[in-house]
Amino acid sequence: MKNKLPPFIEIYRALIATPSISATEEALDQSNADLITLLADWFKDLGFNVEVQPVPGTRNKFNMLASCGQGAGGLLLAGHTDTVPFDDGRWTRDPFTLTEHDGKLYGLGTADMKGFFAFILDALRDVDVTKLKKPLYILATADEETSMAGARYFAETTALRPDCAIIGEPTSLQPVRAHKGHISNAIRIQGQSGHSSDPARGVNAIELMHDAIGHILQLRDNLKERYHYEAFTVPYPTLNLGHIHGGDASNRICACCELHMDIRPLPGMTLNELNGLLNDALAPVSERWPGRLTVDELHPPIPGYECPPNHQLVEVVEKLLGAKTEVVNYCTEAPFIQTLCPTLVLGPGSINQAHQPDEYLETRFIKPTRELITQVIHHFCWH
């Protein structure tokens, strides 16, 4: 029953008080089961059918899909339930206690992005879901901050094909229709150790990596020259060499060298295409030194994403907000949800608060966010 739903600020407070940190380091990683249970119970109280889905390959993580209404199409509102870890020494407040001060709501996940679910639930108080003409879906995912395993698994397994979707990441209520992807690789070269007094008796991995880096930098130049998307502030794919390590002593021939690099592809560039370009760039080294060079993923890759600028979702949201859609450089779950339906990224709070100590959401976003959610539900589920 709707009268069982707590007030908006109490929903917000309960979400922030329920830890759901995701991290690659097992000691820091937490299940989101308690948070999913909270959300599931509230959406059931509002008359939604709720499905909780274990996400394979995770440490006890779950997705939740709440649905109401019949038929095809409809609207999907989506977000992730996890937060990043926090640095206790840099927070001046308890990360798990929602506090309000000077027009700001503080707490871990206030902006990125547990708060979005509080806004959805609050907006639905005044919506008679029994009268929806098209279905409304609410998706809460797991592990966005690490592998995006929840969104990947949902997109791979669901039969849903809504008319459109909105992911409530913090965009300061500026609609986002495209962003770059992210690929992170480790280049490893296995040499042969030996005493530095006789270089011919070994294979110096640092020297081979020097050769490989030259080819990688040529790839970087080629990407900049061949691919352009003028809407981005950096209108080409970027390639960064971020970390390198090799050798253990000045008088030993280096036996192993490892380089970590990333590429941020433009929308429309496929992961297979990028892998092919990287392998082609490194082919001269691999051919000269067979079996000594390997390329491994550091993280699951994220493709670029774009919602067609002339889609009805873009037109409706731009009209409601009086603002044009933007493109951004950070990544979200949109590439995976976009495989199901046209998708925008749009939510309260600033991306500048994401992953920051003393994270907050400004209270000025409360009224317009509630109004926006109500309006998009009316447009896509009642018309």
Curated annotation (Swiss-Prot):
Homodimer. It catalyses: N(2)-acetyl-L-ornithine + H2O = L-ornithine + acetate. InterPro entries: AcOrn-deacetyl, ArgE/DapE_CS, Bact_exopeptidase_dim_dom, Peptidase_M20, Peptidase_M20_dimer, Peptidase_M20A. Pfam families: M20_dimer, Peptidase_M20. The gene is argE. It is an enzyme of class 3 (hydrolase). This is Acetylornithine deacetylase. Transmembrane segments: none annotated. The keyword Transcription regulation does not apply. GO terms for biological process: L-arginine biosynthetic process. Belongs to the peptidase M20A family. ArgE subfamily. Keywords: Amino-acid biosynthesis, Arginine biosynthesis, Cobalt, Cytoplasm, Hydrolase, Metal-binding, Zinc. Catalyzes the hydrolysis of the amide bond of N(2)-acetylated L-amino acids. Cleaves the acetyl group from N-acetyl-L-ornithine to form L-ornithine, an intermediate in L-arginine biosynthesis pathway, and a branchpoint in the synthesis of polyamines. Binds 2 Zn(2+) or Co(2+) ions per subunit. The keyword Phosphoprotein does not apply. Zn(2+) 2 binds at residues 112, 145, 355. The lineage of its organism: Bacteria, Pseudomonadati, Pseudomonadota, Gammaproteobacteria, Enterobacterales. It is found in: Cytoplasm. Zn(2+) 1 binds at residues 80, 112, 169. It comes from the Bacteria. The active site is at 82, 144. Its main location: cytoplasm.
